[in-house]
């Protein structure tokens, strides 16, 4: 839900942002590009962080990136600040997506498909609710800043839940499933067929 909620907030609010700070659509595109750049980079590093520091760490880090990103984004007035903070939001969203999928796959090995479908259904619910709520708030005169700040009422409790939630212990990997360190990862990537 959180991923769909935050991911779809930008689409509804970008026209209000451009109007509020006097940006053109080119600068708006730069802002949106920055979020997806953060998301893209998170797809490479979230799994590695989960392997090195644990699944809980990567999920909590995702929540913290979202909190800091939203606070900064809602307070921004210069393009560089918007770009930096929405990049942080993108990192949080990418880490959240990968960490959530990773945890669900590990916990529900027998019924992965069912639980991954549920995860995506909740993404869809967040994606549907967000434009409706954000559009309503914009229509009654709220600023995009207020809308992003209100999103903290969703992000903060979920992040606190990530912190206090108990995660099942990973089973000890056998020799075939041992963790890959960074040097091994570079070797695998640089091998030629």
Put a short name on every predicted segment:
Residues 110-111, 115-167:
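Helix-loop-helix hairpin linking two adjacent transmembrane segments in secondary transporters
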Residues 8, 35-44, 127-128:
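Residue-level signature of mid-helix packing/kink "hotspots" within the transmembrane helices
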Residues 85-121:
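Cytoplasmic helix-loop-helix junction between adjacent transmembrane helices
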Residues 4, 8, 90-98, 128:
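Small-residue-rich segments within alpha-helical transmembrane domains of MFS-like 12-TM solute carriers
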């Amino acid at each position: 839900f959180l991923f769909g909620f935050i991911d779809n907030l930008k689409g509804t609010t970008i026209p209000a942002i451009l109007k509020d700070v006097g940006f053109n659509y080119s600068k708006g595109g730069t802002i949106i590009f920055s979020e997806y750049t953060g998301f893209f980079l998170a797809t490479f590093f979230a799994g590695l962080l989960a392997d090195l520091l644990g699944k809980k760490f990567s999920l909590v880090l995702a929540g913290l990136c979202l909190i800091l990103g939203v606070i900064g984004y809602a307070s921004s007035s210069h393009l560089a600040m918007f770009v930096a903070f929405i990049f942080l939001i993108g990192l949080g969203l990418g880490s959240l997506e990968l960490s959530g999928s990773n945890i669900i796959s590990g916990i529900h090995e027998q019924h992965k498909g069912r639980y991954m479908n549920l995860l995506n259904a909740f993404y869809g619910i967040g994606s549907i609710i967000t434009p409706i709520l954000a559009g309503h708030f914009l229509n009654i005169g709220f600023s995009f800043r207020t809308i992003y700040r209100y999103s903290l009422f969703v992000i903060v409790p979920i992040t606190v839940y990530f912190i206090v939630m108990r995660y099942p212990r990973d089973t000890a990997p056998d020799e075939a499933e041992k963790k890959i360190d960074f040097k091994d990862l570079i070797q695998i990537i640089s091998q030629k067929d």
